[in-house]
Amino acid sequence: MKLTCVLIIAVLFLTACQLTTGEQKDHALRSTDKNSKLTRQCTPVGGYCSRHYHCCSNHCIKSIGRCVAH
C-alpha cells in the first residue's frame, strides 16, 4: 500500500515537472513578444498618444491625445 502511494506521488510529481517545462517554452515566446514591444520607438513630445507608455516622456494627456514633457 505504501509503495503504491509512493509510486503515485512520484508519477504525479514527474507529470507536474513536465507540464511546468512545457509552460516555460511558451513563456519564452511570450517574453520575446514582450521584448519586441519594448523595442518599439516611442512617440515624441507633441505626438499622438492614447497611453502614457507610448510617449518618450512617459506623459500622455489623454483628453487631447498628445504626449507632453514632464
Swiss-Prot record:
Keywords: Disulfide bond, Knottin, Neurotoxin, Pyrrolidone carboxylic acid, Secreted, Signal, Toxin. This is Conotoxin ArMKLT2-0112. Residues 1-22 form the signal peptide. Expressed by the venom duct. Belongs to the conotoxin O1 superfamily. Residues 23-40 form a propeptide. It comes from the Eukaryota. GO terms for cellular component: extracellular region. It is found in: Secreted. Its main location: secreted. Disulfide bonds join C42-C56, C49-C60, C55-C67. The modification Pyrrolidone carboxylic acid is found at Q41. GO terms for molecular function: ion channel inhibitor activity; toxin activity. The presence of a 'disulfide through disulfide knot' structurally defines this protein as a knottin. Pfam families: Conotoxin (PF02950).
